[in-house]
Amino acid sequence: DKLEEIFDRPDGGLEISKGISTSVPDLGALRKSRPDQSPSEIGPNVIELCQMADITFMALHGSIGENGKLQATFDNLGIKYTGPNSLGCTLSMNKLVTKQIFKTSGVPTPRGTSLTVKTKDTRLDELGYYLPLVVKPCSNGSSIGVYICHTEEDYYDAIHKSFDIDNTDEVVIEPFIKGREFACGIPLVEIVPKDGLFDYANKYQAGGASEICPPVSLDAETQELIQRAGERAFEALRMDVYSRADFIVSDADGEFYCLEMNALPGMTAASLLPKAAKAAGYE
């Protein structure tokens, strides 16, 4: 009955979770009504309620719902739930581990390295990487804390800002690839941001991006290759139900790369996975 204490430091993905439905209770009012004024997003009696249900629908984003803790708790208690199991969530939440698994499984992915709190002052010229670069928290969701760095000043500023994000003790650094983005669910959805990166704002603001399914700018053969790579990625990360792999096709050479895996992709009417499912014939 103290499950809520395990999840007392939610990250930025929480804002998206609150936006899943307009019919959810007022969480601010709910917290104020608690005798202990607990700020937890998971309150008392959650376990009892979930045990009463035939199945629990997972609609949590960011580490609070995708790092595998909640799934492991439910597994131990015999509670059925939607989405991947605890192992799949744990593996995919860590972007560096995901890269390593992709490489051993034949899934094309950008090379990358990481810095921890102890090594965050490492100079750019010591990394063996060249600008432009992408800097992002090793374990976070919704593209929160993702920075594209074109100058050394950008790089050091991004490192500083990334480590300022709650619960961030490691950041991933990888080459920036300019290209077209595709979400693989398995049918592909092409993502065309209105302005620059498909970041937090463009993902969740109306009109932030155009989403085309099936893609019209990609030939059938390349679509098939990306879908097969997506299947290998799902299998390698133990994504045994539904999930979404994000790919980019390089403008420079036409090669495609898997950027990361989303264990619990958005499931609103405007989200990418439901659009892909509809294109595949699922309503």
What are the residue ranges of the model-derived segments?
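Active-site nucleotide/adenylate-binding loops and adjacent lid/helix of ATP-dependent enzymes
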Residues: 43-50, 89-172, 178-179
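Phosphate-binding site of ATP-dependent enzymes
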Residues: 150-228, 255-257
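Conserved metal-phosphate-binding beta-hairpin within the catalytic cores
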Residues: 175, 184-186, 234-267, 277
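Residue-level detector of anion-binding/catalytic polar loops
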Residues: 80, 108, 283
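Short beta-strands and strand-loop turn motifs
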Residues: 80-85, 111, 137, 258
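ATP-binding N-terminal substructure of ATP-dependent carboxylate-amine bond-forming enzymes
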Residues: 1-87, 91-93, 97, 104, ...
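Glycine-rich phosphate/pyrophosphate-binding beta-alpha loops
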Residues: 62, 143, 194, 262-276
